[in-house]
Regions:
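Hydrophobic transmembrane alpha-helices
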Residues: 12-56, 61, 65-159
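Short, small-residue-biased leader/transition segments that mark boundaries at the very start
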Residues: 2-3
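Extended, charge-rich helix/loop segments that form flexible
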Residues: 9
Length: 159
């Protein structure tokens, strides 16, 4: 339990490190740059994507007719984990806000969105959920077709 809490603390620190670097800048606030605009756009798009994906999944799961089914409608028809794409976009947008502040060792703050991406796609989020889904629906040909035809994270916008 102690190691688990320490690992979670490290996880939180690495993820929020980009915010710490941005907020620790001294002096007057610099002029807004194109990086700030790009960061705001990416953050907003990621936030909206995550919220819409989570709401769609909640509404799907709240419908008794969908009990025991996987969601393959709305954003979930384009990506098996659109909420995670939103999370990755959100943290990447925050990192873009910091581009003007990153100099020297502060550039290591870019580890934050990379860490979020690796964590969600290789360690905790996607692998765990995909394994559970295979355990639950792995014998269902329709699910296997959905899994084969629907990208994990980045949607295929043209079919």
């Amino acid at each position: 339990d102690v190691y688990k809490r320490q690992l979670q603390g490290l996880w939180v620190f690495v993820t929020m490190n980009v915010v710490i670097v941005i907020n620790s800048q001294s002096g007057l606030s610099p002029e807004l740059t194109v990086w700030d605009a790009l960061g705001a756009i990416l953050w907003t798009a990621g936030f909206c994507l995550e919220v819409v994906a989570d709401r769609q999944k909640s509404a799907f799961n709240a419908n008794p007719a969908n009990e025991g089914k996987w969601i393959d409608e709305g954003l979930w028809s384009l990506s098996r984990h659109p909420n995670y794409l939103g999370e990755i976009m959100l943290w990447s947008g925050i990192a873009l806000f910091g581009v003007p502040c990153f100099s020297g060792m502060e550039g290591l703050a870019w580890v934050s969105p990379i860490f979020v991406y690796i964590l969600l796609t290789k360690v905790s989020g996607v692998p765990i959920l995909d394994r559970r889904a295979l355990e639950k629906w792995g014998e269902d040909a329709a699910y296997l077709q959905y899994r084969e035809n629907t990208p994990q994270i980045l949607p295929r916008l043209v079919r």
